[in-house]
Every structure is written in structure tokens, then in C-alpha cells.
Amino acid sequence: TVGLYTSPHLKDYRERIKINGNEISEDFVCEFINENKPFFEANELSFFEMTVGLAFDYFAKEKVDIAIIEVGMGGRLDATNIITPLVSVITNIGLDHTQFLGNTLEAIAFEKAGIIKPEIPVVIGEYTSETKAIFLAKAKENNSEIYFSSDLIRESYPSDLIGDYQVHNKKTVLQTIAIINSQKEFKIYESDIKTGLLNVVKNTGLKGRWQKLGEFPKIICDTAHNKNGLEIVLKQIQKEKFDSLHIVLGVVNDKDLDEVLPLFPTKAIYYFCKPNIPRGLDAKILEDNARKFHLLGKTYASVTEAYNESQNIAKE
């Protein structure tokens, strides 16, 4: 059995914790909270720390064979970093959460390198010359074998995740599997790799990764939310054939708008909305800031209203 812990969730909190693709039950979540509430309150644990505790407790009680654990933020001080894994994986480094992790790639790489454990192999997905030096130093300090998947992996397999950026992710996956297979605890066969990569969405439930929601008009949903991610997604959008481009846009209130808004194309119609979460930025504030970068459109009372209106106009 395989446990999967990811964050954040899109619609349902239980998306974060799955075994063999099935979400944790509501009963288990409620029992865990009731049982541990005094401890949580006494120690002032964060929402994320409580959720990590829930995931680990669930995986332990269900006796999963393998657990895939995604770090929440950074790595060195993250609640997930109490484990000793079979292999550590660092996918890429972007300027995100800079108020907590530092405002240079080197500072953020240092935090992410904190998941490198003594004598545990580490796979690096993407790197720059600055971040590579930090990863190499940390691996040497821990006597850990280090693998840069973008330099080592040549073969590829088709996947139901079709964003351009998945090329890098697939290389990282293949390198990680090669290391796990070399440890001889169990074997992941090539047929399993092929099937797995063709069924990522079905097996994980992950949504919003260059996800096609419709064909007439073509509708793409992507949850890219930092400069690196947006640059890649917007570049891929420009490769698409279209007569007109309609962008439904909502952000959270701590987003650096002066950094991300200049990335968006001016030749598009914008539908500004507020995500239905406490951290959502008011749509009017977003529209006012977007106008400074010549991104023009209207504000809508909800994401659903903006989405429906964009479809109606695109069909005309």
C-alpha cells in the first residue's frame, strides 16, 4: 500500500492524505482531532503541523509499505522533516515564501537542502549554478549520494500530465525510482512506471496541472502561483492556437503583484475574482493593480461567475 501526503488541497481537506488513491475518512480525522485536541492547544501547533501529525498517525496505523511525503514549505524546519526517508527529492527552487525562506535562490536552496539526511541519497530535479553548489556541499556534509536528474535521465514516457514543465518532473521521478530499485527492498518494474505515468491524475487525484476542462472553447486550468510556475504556464499558453484569450484570475492577499502581473499578456480579456478562502485578495484590488500593467477586464463576485462569463463570451 502507498500513502500520499500533499498540500494544499483544492476543495476537500481530505485530499491531502490518501492511501492507494483513497482519501482519509472523515471519521478518522474527527477521532484524531478529538483525541489530540488538548495536546494541540497546549503546544500551540499550527494547522500544518496538526495535519502532518494526522497523516503520519494514519499511515502508521494503516501500515503503509511506502509513504510519499511532500514538504509544506522549505524543508529544514518543516514539520515533515522528522522522517528518515529512503530517498530525498528536491524538485526545483523558486522565489516563493520569501518572507520565511529568504529572498535569494541560495537562501531558499539552503532551506530546501535541510531535508538531505546522513547517508540517504538525494535527487535534484532542476538547479542553477548557485543552488547546485549548496546542494553539493550539504550532500558532502551528510555523506549522501547526490543525483542531478536533468543531467542523468534521457528516456521519457508519455503521461496524462501534459504541461511542458512535466518533462522535468518525469526525469526526477525516473531517477528517484532508479535509486529505490537499487536498494533492493522492492522493485518497481518498467511496466509499472509506464502505467503509473499514464494514470497520475487517477492515482493521486491531483488537479489543476495544465488540466483541460473543455475543448469548445478550449479551457485550461492551472494552479501555478509563483513567478517560476507562471512563466512556464504562460509560455505554454502562447504556443496554443487561439483567436482570443480569456484569463480568469484570482490570487491570495500576500502575493507580490508587482512581480507576477507583468508576466501576463496584455492581449487578453481578464475576469478578476476573489478565491473563496479567507486569504483571497479582493477582486477590485486585483483589477486596479492589473490595470497598471495594461491588463484589462472586469471584476466578478465569485470564481464561478467569472468562469461562466468567460465561457459565454469565448463561445460568441
Where are these regions (language model features)?
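Nucleotide phosphate-binding/pyrophosphate-handling subdomain across enzymes
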Residues: 66-71, 79-89, 93-97, 107, ...
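C-terminal helical cap/extension that packs against the catalytic core
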Residues: 128-147, 218-220, 261-315
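Short internal beta-strands
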Residues: 5, 121-126, 248-249, 268-276
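Conserved catalytic-core segment of NTP-binding enzymes
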Residues: 75-77, 84-143
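Active-site-proximal loop->helix
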Residues: 8-35, 99-116, 122, 136-137, ...
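Glycine-rich phosphate-binding loop signature in dinucleotide/nucleotide-binding domains
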Residues: 59-65, 237-243, 310-316
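ATP-dependent carboxylate-amine ligase catalytic core
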Residues: 3-83, 101, 130
